[in-house]
Amino acid sequence: MPTISQLIGSERKRLTRKTKSPALKSCPERRGVCTRVYTSTPKKPNSALRKVARVRLTSGFEVTAYIPGIGHNLQEHSVVLLRGGRVKDLPGVRYHIIRGTLDTAGVKDRRQSRSKYGAKAPKD
């Protein structure tokens, strides 16, 4: 605990928080181009083939992003929109691709949580 004299000499240092999504550069979303689309296996207790893409962003970063939902139409050179949000069981994946924008199609036949997957309202 500093004394009053010490505080007069120099003020308290502000704590700087480290961002969890540095590639977005304080923007809510970023556009990018897929350089590689592939599957990755999750960490120890889980087992799956998670769909991920390597994306070169307009901010100059190249990051790994998760493709949510069942089925996708992404391939190399697809233009995508990225948001923050990590995938807990995939190390190094700190971004999500937004479905239903730019070259990314929405999830087909999605009935619930449609807005999160870019799915249109069902016809019936």
Swiss-Prot record:
GO biological process, one term: translation
Disordered: region residues: 1-28, 104-124
In-chain residues carrying the UniProt-annotated modification 3-methylthioaspartic acid: 89
GO cellular component: a single term: small ribosomal subunit
InterPro entries for this protein: NA-bd_OB-fold, Ribosomal_uS12, Ribosomal_uS12_bac
One Pfam family of this chain: Ribosom_S12_S23
Keywords (A to Z) from UniProt: Methylation, Ribonucleoprotein, Ribosomal protein, RNA-binding, rRNA-binding, tRNA-binding
GO molecular function per UniProt: rRNA binding; structural constituent of ribosome; tRNA binding
Purpose of the protein: With S4 and S5 plays an important role in translational accuracy.
Subunit structure: Part of the 30S ribosomal subunit. Contacts proteins S8 and S17. May interact with IF1 in the 30S initiation complex.
HAMAP family named among the record's database cross-references: Ribosomal_uS12_B
Family: Belongs to the universal ribosomal protein uS12 family.
PANTHER family (UniProt xref): 30S RIBOSOMAL PROTEIN S12 FAMILY MEMBER
Protein name: Small ribosomal subunit protein uS12
Organism of this sequence: Prochlorococcus marinus (strain MIT 9312)
Gene name of the encoded protein: rpsL
